[in-house]
């Protein structure tokens, strides 16, 4: 999942698993000088142990990654995108969870996924980029971002109607 991580991830370390451990830099929750601080959006300067950060859908156990303000995070994720589709791993592509929710704006999301596609396709032109999307995917499928989508609502709506006669399952 590229739009958030777990609060236990070494980048955040809310559970303080890595705090004081040899070989680990302090997490962004633990120390304002953490090398990972820019990976997250904090709303206060309450360190140590700053609980005031964006969580995916408001969940503090799922800290939302802050691509817009961290070029180092972007570059790190782009390298991951390339690494796994290259030798010796040679995976066939990427399945992107909640891809349209990556950043804080649709405009930024489109910019990032264009960069991601370019990086992945440079490493492996045949790699597939499959994104989870739950709205109209047309703007993402213009040949410069995702190759295809999986859409739970588009699948569930007709199945639910067929099985139950209920027109919408997601109200």
Question: Can you name each region flagged by the protein language model?
Answer:
Residues 1-171:
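Active-site and adjacent substrate-binding regions of carbohydrate-active enzymes
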């Amino acid at each position: 999942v590229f739009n958030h991580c777990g609060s236990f991830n070494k980048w955040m370390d809310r559970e303080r698993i890595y705090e004081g451990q040899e070989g680990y830099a302090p997490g962004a929750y633990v120390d304002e000088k953490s090398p990972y601080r820019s990976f997250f959006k904090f709303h206060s300067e309450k360190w140590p142990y700053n609980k005031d950060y964006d969580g995916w859908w408001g969940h503090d156990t799922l800290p939302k990654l802050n691509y817009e303000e961290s070029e180092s995070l972007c570059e790190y994720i782009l390298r991951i995108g390339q690494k796994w589709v290259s030798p010796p791993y040679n995976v066939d592509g990427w399945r992107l969870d909640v891809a349209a929710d990556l950043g804080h704006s649709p405009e930024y999301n489109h910019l990032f996924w264009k960069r991601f596609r370019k990086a992945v396709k440079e490493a492996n032109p045949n790699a597939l980029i499959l994104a989870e999307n739950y709205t109209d995917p047309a703007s993402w499928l213009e040949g410069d971002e995702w190759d295809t989508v999986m859409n739970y609502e588009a699948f569930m709506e007709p199945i639910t109607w067929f099985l139950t006669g209920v027109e919408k399952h997601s109200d």
